[in-house]
């Protein structure tokens, strides 16, 4: 997660769908940040965020409060992954023929970690 726009938008969409079709459960929302730039994980403002995942190198997310609500409402979790874990996930994806930028590999790193 960087500015947390995606996770908040996804949650909004899941809720709108759920209101119309209650036969499906709402998901538990998971968000992953680089350990060098993890303001939502650590509940702080990171003055000098540092990570190879430039797309999520955000020290003070615009959607901080919305993201906190998503975590609470969905009974979800936010966790951090190291740059090394991101790189390892990136390499694993590449072996499968899937090429992405490091911020996208952060989610896969988080899933591997769990």
What annotation goes with each model-predicted range?
Residues 7-17:
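Short Gly/Thr/Asp-enriched flexible loops that form oxyanion-binding sites at enzyme active sites
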Residues 110-114:
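Catalytic phosphate/nucleotide-handling subdomain of diverse soluble enzymes
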Residues 88, 106-109:
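Amphipathic alpha-helical interaction segments
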Residues 1-7, 104-106:
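Gly/Ser/Thr-rich loops at beta-strand to alpha-helix junctions
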Residues 15-102:
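Active-site/ligand-binding loops adjacent to catalytic centers
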């Amino acid at each position: 997660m960087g500015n947390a726009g995606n996770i908040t938008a996804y949650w909004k969409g899941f809720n709108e769908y759920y209101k119309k079709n209650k036969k499906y459960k709402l998901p538990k929302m998971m968000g992953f940040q680089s350990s060098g730039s993890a303001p939502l994980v650590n509940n702080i403002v990171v003055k000098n965020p540092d990570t190879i995942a430039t797309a999520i190198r955000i020290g003070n997310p615009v959607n901080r409060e919305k993201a906190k609500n998503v975590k609470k409402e969905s009974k979800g979790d936010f966790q951090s992954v190291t740059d090394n874990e991101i790189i390892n996930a990136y390499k694993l994806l590449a072996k499968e023929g899937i090429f992405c930028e490091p911020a996208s590999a952060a989610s896969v790193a988080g899933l591997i970690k769990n």
